[in-house]
């Protein structure tokens, strides 16, 4: 049973939430590290791990799934070239979340999420 195993809603409708997670995933893979709220960082962690696992697989079907999710096609090519060399021995846990000081305007818990 999958009781209480839901995705964080992030205070947004489903389409906006999916677009936000896609954008955060794309930017994290592009820059290697982003600053966001702690809840968003925890939500995007599973998506980034899924993209890196697809890149380690390296098959055409995995590449097409990544192209359908990430916003930048050139980024998909770079990810698929580097993932097996960078994360070849690692079985998951490709990201690290570091808590930082709260945001000034609304005191939201902030975090830095980065690729290991």
Curated annotation (Swiss-Prot):
Show the PROSITE patterns listed in the entry: RIBOSOMAL_L17
- UniProt family annotation: Belongs to the bacterial ribosomal protein bL17 family.
GO terms of molecular function: structural constituent of ribosome
- Identify this protein by name: Large ribosomal subunit protein bL17
Keywords for the protein's UniProt record, in alphabetical order: Ribonucleoprotein, Ribosomal protein
Does the keyword Ribonucleoprotein feature in the UniProt annotation? yes
Q: Superkingdom of the source? A: Bacteria
A single GO BP term for this record reads: translation
Q: Which organism is it from?
A: Cyanothece sp. (strain PCC 7425 / ATCC 29141)
User: What's any one GO cellular component for it?
Assistant: cytosolic large ribosomal subunit
Q: How does it assemble?
A: Part of the 50S ribosomal subunit. Contacts protein L32.
Q: Which HAMAP family match?
A: Ribosomal_bL17
């Amino acid at each position: 049973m999958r009781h209480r195993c839901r995705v964080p809603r992030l205070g947004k409708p489903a389409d906006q939430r999916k677009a936000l997670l896609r954008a955060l995933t794309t930017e994290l893979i592009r820059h290697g590290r982003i600053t966001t709220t702690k809840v968003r960082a925890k939500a995007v962690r599973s998506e980034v791990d899924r993209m890196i696992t697809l890149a380690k697989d390296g098959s055409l079907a995995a590449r097409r799934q990544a192209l359908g999710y990430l916003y930048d096609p050139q980024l998909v090519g770079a990810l698929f070239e580097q993932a097996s060399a960078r994360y070849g021995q690692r079985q998951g846990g490709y990201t690290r979340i570091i808590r930082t000081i709260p945001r000034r305007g609304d005191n939201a818990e902030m975090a830095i999420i980065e690729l290991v």
